[in-house]
Amino acid sequence: MATAAYEQLKLHITPEKFYVEACDDGADDVLTIDRVSTEVTLAVKKDVPPSAVTRPIFGILGTIHLVAGNYLIVITKKIKVGEFFSHVVWKATDFDVLSYKKTMLHLTDIQLQDNKTFLAMLNHVLNVDGFYFSTTYDLTHTLQRLSNTSPEFQEMSLLERADQRFVWNGHLLRELSAQPEVHRFALPVLHGFITMHSCSINGKYFDWILISRRSCFRAGVRYYVRGIDSEGHAANFVETEQIVHYNGSKASFVQTRGSIPVFWSQRPNLKYKPLPQISKVANHMDGFQRHFDSQVIIYGKQVIINLINQKGSEKPLEQTFATMVSSLGSGMMRYIAFDFHKECKNMRWDRLSILLDQVAEMQDELSYFLVDSAGQVVANQEGVFRSNCMDCLDRTNVIQSLLARRSLQAQLQRLGVLHVGQKLEEQDEFEKIYKNAWADNANACAKQYAGTGALKTDFTRTGKRTHLGLIMDGWNSMIRYYKNNFSDGFRQDSIDLFLGNYSVDELESHSPLSVPRDWKFLALPIIMVVAFSMCIICLLMAGDTWTETLAYVLFWGVASIGTFFIILYNGKDFVDAPRLVQKEKID
């Protein structure tokens, strides 16, 4: 049993110090943070001055250094998600960012503006839905990983034992991490999605849980973070675990998703779908092998399901992925290419059964994790399906939900919830819960990476592709286009700041946020708008003859269209690009 973190806290604020008081039964600890020296110490309740301003909080997210100095980030609101084997799981829904400094008079105007921008970045990340924590249970590990731990591991604090891939406030907690005596004040926070449901089939009640854990390594937004880095971390890597708890028995099925693990990019350039660029100079095999070496160590066998198009702009990526798997020649890897869009065109989504039939035997070999009511491990999951499309969102989520249902069918039959021959699809009440949960999971993962809800969720929710779903996909695609081109640079900077990929240095002579714009950035859009406006005016206010009107319309029309294509040609100069961290530029 891990050493629990404190659940009930009070924050006492004085001009000199922050005091975080533990209010759990029998607790006398007070975490003290000096607002001048930034020193963190442990005190007792009698050390809190009665003059302090007091407020309840629900956890410490951590501290961060900005231009104005240090800031303390605390959780101010939470909602209960459910109970996980008698452990309460919470979603953090509101935060407060508190400055150590009492005044900003020591800052110049430029520093004040930069500090304001950095605070806006912090708040942007905090406002993204999907931060979860528990004060008594380790949410960062799967059931199978937790079952294979030593007694020493189980005695560690939640912070010490957490899987660092999924601790999104790891950088913010670095000061508390260095002092084991204050670990009970430190909450490892997960980013992703968690839902819990009490369900009933055949009069038998069981808990069904879905957890998606987003990796904080190579984290970012859709078009600015693709492929892998030099350490083998894949973009948009998510570990998804489905858990069943029935009569003391526990079963789980784990899947992963992650960007195609080679060095490639797809930077926005105002085009609806920028061309993917595969690096011609990077050592793809080195990064590829690093990625899968770590995946095999953590999860075992890898069944790779590549769902991207096998023609057009996506074809080179599919060929590269297949070549890499073949060249590595590992017996721990199986590669399956399934052209999702080709197979399911004309809304023939029933054809997904082709893929499910193809991998059925492999899924049976991989199995799932099962512990009986006596605590004995009955079955281990021997590997995972690693699914991907271009974004690892829409197509990926559809396939994962179908694979998870097949595993759940086997688990519930083995546990005696389903009768022999009974199909999960026939259990209408549970099916509704199941489909909606997986659609909600898709939306959460999509919003965190692409900025909008997922596409194709009408199929996940209903089992059918609908015309309304197509319209909603079109709307979400338009929103994605706007965000990817005109706001994702800020979103990427926000994530890099939050995760510590960029550290603020107030002594920097040049502000990283100040990026001079080329003359084209202002001049060309103005010319295009003026030319288009003149074209409309000429149409509305006809000249003396139709030839004169036509000449004016043609002139201004050609000017506006020509300017538009010049802007499109120079698209990368017009998009909102990250400013804090330069990712590998390989295009």
From Swiss-Prot:
It comes from the Eukaryota. Residues 452-587 are annotated as: Essential for phosphatidylinositol-4-phosphate phosphatase activity. One of its GO terms (biological process) is phosphatidylinositol biosynthetic process. It catalyses: a 1,2-diacyl-sn-glycero-3-phospho-(1D-myo-inositol-3-phosphate) + H2O = a 1,2-diacyl-sn-glycero-3-phospho-(1D-myo-inositol) + phosphate; a 1,2-diacyl-sn-glycero-3-phospho-(1D-myo-inositol 4-phosphate) + H2O = a 1,2-diacyl-sn-glycero-3-phospho-(1D-myo-inositol) + phosphate. The chain crosses the membrane at residues 521-541, 549-569. Signal peptide: none annotated. The modification N6-acetyllysine is found at residue 456. Keywords: Acetylation, Endoplasmic reticulum, Golgi apparatus, Hydrolase, Lipid metabolism, Membrane, Transmembrane, Transmembrane helix. It is a multi-pass membrane protein. Residues 122-451 form the SAC domain. Residues 542-548 are lumenal. Inhibited by bis-peroxovanadates and hydrogen peroxide. One of its GO terms (cellular component) is endoplasmic reticulum. Residues 1-520, 570-587 are cytoplasmic. Its main location: endoplasmic reticulum. The keyword Signal does not apply. Its EC number is 3.1.3.64. InterPro entries: SAC_dom. Detected in heart, brain, lung, liver, kidney, pancreas and testis. GO terms for molecular function: phosphatase activity; phosphatidylinositol phosphate 4-phosphatase activity; phosphatidylinositol-3-phosphate phosphatase activity; phosphatidylinositol-4-phosphate phosphatase activity. It is found in: Endoplasmic reticulum membrane; Golgi apparatus membrane. Phosphoinositide phosphatase which catalyzes the hydrolysis of phosphatidylinositol 4-phosphate (PtdIns(4)P). Can also catalyze the hydrolysis of phosphatidylinositol 3-phosphate (PtdIns(3)P) and has low activity towards phosphatidylinositol-3,5-bisphosphate (PtdIns(3,5)P2). Shows a very robust PtdIns(4)P phosphatase activity when it binds PtdIns(4)P in a 'cis' configuration in the cellular environment, with much less activity seen when it binds PtdIns(4)P in 'trans' configuration. Interacts with TMEM39A. Interacts with SEC23A and SEC24A; this interaction is reduced in the absence of TMEM39A. Interacts with PLEKHA3 and VAPA and/or VAPB to form a ternary complex. This is Phosphatidylinositol-3-phosphatase SAC1. The gene is SACM1L.
